[in-house]
Amino acid sequence: MASWNQRTVAKRVSCTGVGLHSGRPATLTLAPAPADAGITFVRMDLGVEIPARNEHVVDTMLSTSLGRGGARVATVEHVMAALHGMGIDACRVEVDGPEIPILDGSAAPFTCLVQEAGVKVLPAGKRYLVVDQPVEIRDGDKLARLEPADGFSVSFTADFGHPLITDQSFQVKLGERAFEREVARARTFCFRRDIEKMQAMGLAKGGSLENAIVVDEFSILNPEGLRFPDEFARHKVLDAIGDLALFGMPVVGALVAVKSGHAMNQALVKKVLADPAAHRVVRVTGEADAPALRAKVPALAIHEGSAA
């Protein structure tokens, strides 16, 4: 039954790094939260709490930012993907500045934080957003579509018109530690030609070969190369998982995305939430509910037996 109950981290754990776009030092702490609290970002320097939900998205340029009452937290997608991928339903994400530390540019350091903290099972059943009808956003050759499915899967096709990133695809079905094995280590990336442009806009001030894959006209500049042959598409899957985590609960459905980004992902979340016919929220209130839901979402009983 534990795998169908909500989960939080068992103790406080912290890490320190720099913000990718702000370049400012940042300390992040994952802290336990009670059942039904969801994920909440806390600007410790301002004393402002920002629920990790789509309604609080304030910017989607190059990353996803949340805001409330004049306070913002930028680049939330990697830590959100890690919490979702590790099955965490409730958590306080405390940060002492305006941006989440980028660390190595992937979600792996955040999954390690969850592993270091351990997991505590809470006395309340999980809630799932079940997709009942397809919903999609299109913009030219870009697509983001969420459709009914068993479990939660993401399929992404990336095409940047670059010799190394042309028609690159990756698909994953979450559950059975698939996020840790196949997605978490994929790093963010950028093109060398865009760096000066981004910095002129006040962005990418903390970027380096230590926290991003940098690509020039023909090659990867990072001396260690890629972690996966299709690392670019895998990272776009990571971003999409983090963006869809702003539903505020696990999704039962399949995301099919082609060249989408943070703005399109959040537009899709908003469109699904605005259509009562397209989705429903199901809560597991006891062991009796689990078999019926398990038939629909066999992949969502993740990390069974690993929680305290």
Swiss-Prot record:
Listed name of the protein: UDP-3-O-acyl-N-acetylglucosamine deacetylase
Entry binding sites for Zn(2+): H78, H235, D239
NCBIfam families for this protein: lpxC
Listed pathway(s): Glycolipid biosynthesis; lipid IV(A) biosynthesis; lipid IV(A) from (3R)-3-hydroxytetradecanoyl-[acyl-carrier-protein] and UDP-N-acetyl-alpha-D-glucosamine: step 2/6
Enzyme class: hydrolase
Database matches in PANTHER family: UDP-3-O-ACYL-N-ACETYLGLUCOSAMINE DEACETYLASE 1, MITOCHONDRIAL-RELATED
Function: Catalyzes the hydrolysis of UDP-3-O-myristoyl-N-acetylglucosamine to form UDP-3-O-myristoylglucosamine and acetate, the committed step in lipid A biosynthesis.
Gene symbol of the encoding locus: lpxC
Cofactor(s), names only, from the UniProt record: Zn(2+)
Catalytic activity: a UDP-3-O-[(3R)-3-hydroxyacyl]-N-acetyl-alpha-D-glucosamine + H2O = a UDP-3-O-[(3R)-3-hydroxyacyl]-alpha-D-glucosamine + acetate
Single Gene Ontology BP annotation: lipid A biosynthetic process
